[in-house]
Amino acid sequence: MLKFGIQNGLNVARAGYSEDQILTACMLADRTGYDSIFYMDHTNVPQWKNAIVLDPWVMLSAIAAVTNHVELGTCVTDAIRRHPSNIALAAITLDRVSKGRAILGIGAGEAQNLKEFCIPFEKPVSKWEEQIQVIKKLYGSTPDNLSLIHI
């Protein structure tokens, strides 16, 4: 079956929609049968000056409070910039407040979100793989016996 979702991010930032307008659009998507809403996880949008960039986990929690059916996910959380324990806690919290509707979208990141903060963009795939290991362990409540290089 074909599913429909909306990505609530780059276009929203560029267009300068207010938080209330974003929430209204998400409520409408929920009521009209959309399957999912994804929110970008960027620190900036350099190609668009004065873009409004909000934390995806906070916005997805706000969206969860005003919707009932749509799944909610990050598009995508950066495994270099965010610590795995923070990612796990944010995803678990969103899943609980949304009553099981959270989707964790996680990737290796990109340089544009790191260079402004002097975070090196080195070995992103290796760091991402380690993040996944840690998050899986945290979900299982057994964060011991990990052999990590980058965290």
Predicted regions and their residues:
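Glycine-rich "substrate-gating" loop/helix at the edge of Rossmann-like oxidoreductase active sites
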Residues: 46-51, 77-83, 120-121
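Structural preference for beta-strand elements that scaffold enzyme active sites
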Residues: 3-7, 36, 69-76, 101-105
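A structural motif corresponding to the C-terminal end of an alpha-helix
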Residues: 32, 66-70, 134, 138-142
